[in-house]
Amino acid sequence: MADRLRRTGRAVSSGDVALAKAPPLVFAGEVDQLRERLAAVARGEALLLQAGDRPGARAALSAAAVRDTLRTLLQMSAVLTYAASVPVVKVGRIAGHYPAPRTGDPGLPTRTYRAAASTLNLVRAFTTGGEADLSQVHAWNREFVTASPAGQRYEAVARGIDKALAFMKACGTDPAGLRSVEFYAAHDVARLDYASALTRTDSRTGAPYATSGHLVRIGDGDRPPDEAHVGFAARIANPVTVRLGPATTVDEVLGYVDRLDPDREPGRLTFALRLGAERVRDLLPELVEKVTASGARPVWVTDPETSSGAPGFDDVLDEVRGFFDVHRSLGTHPGGIHTELTGDDVARDRERPLDLAFRVAEFARSPEPGA
């Protein structure tokens, strides 16, 4: 274990050693299940919805903030599921987006671990304890549609969900899947010491898994991930998201494919794209065509809210529309969307992500590019 920690280029601290002995935050079987779900997304059989705290959010979230973040994500998911008529894989960057190491703070990794464990325990309780009941989630969406200035625009989708739920009730259908959900945690690997200390060898297969989160994310879109982060992601069995920006070249993307998905496994690799509304239609086609020609089947996700300059809502919508238009013109699958939530302000600021979900639902239901 100490040898693995030293590969990060740092001295091994007492906090690293403590984490190396700590229980995993997630389990290998859960990671494998997510890989199966992402493979379905890559094949065009599902969508991926990623959401979570903005970069720089503090490690610890209150129970109310966790609940409101999850509630917003579930509301978005219900709308997208109805609109696209496919399952929506829900991944939250809700337990593992923490600051880079600071000199003189050896206790930070341990505090990070405790905060993540607390958050994930709350998420598991909420997703199985009634908060995720589809009827309740739709009631929240109904409240949003009633209160929203754009409510009339969204009324058709809300009515359609009403009818679908009424039909299932009339048929006597009440599956357990309507009352609980699968929820997965994404972890930004800014801290290799933290992620390496929580890497475990699966007793079933002997493969290494990062147990700090089900899915690991590398890169920030503005700068490519460094060799150490790519090397770490290549060694583990977790699915990997690489964030790409407008300066990312086709050769760089093909390099990530070769390093991170040498076996060309559908869903092993996700590309989160922050290209900007003004450039997505120019840059995305070549990326998709060249990656597809390489034999890879990644999940393509649009990440419009972290494009440079804190884009306005109209720019976000235009980038999402461009993302869908490009994939439709190429005959490939627009795999999903990543959106930023706002920590303890989610309860107050959920209108924008919910507006986005209803507008994406319109794009998903529209048969023609640009409609």
Predicted regions and their residues:
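Intrinsically disordered, low-complexity proline-rich regions
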Residues: 1, 13, 169, 290, ...
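N-terminal basic/disordered segments at the start of proteins
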Residues: 1-50, 54
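Alpha-helix initiation/capping motif
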Residues: 7-9, 13, 27-29, 52, ...
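Short amphipathic alpha-helices and their capping/turn segments at secondary-structure boundaries
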Residues: 30-39, 70-83, 284-295, 321-329
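Short coil/turn connectors at secondary-structure junctions
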Residues: 43-46, 83-86, 266-267, 295-297, ...
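Active-site-facing alpha/beta catalytic cores
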Residues: 55-56, 61-276, 320, 326, ...
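Non-transmembrane, aqueous-exposed alpha-helical and coiled segments at domain scale
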Residues: 256, 268-273, 277-299, 306-346
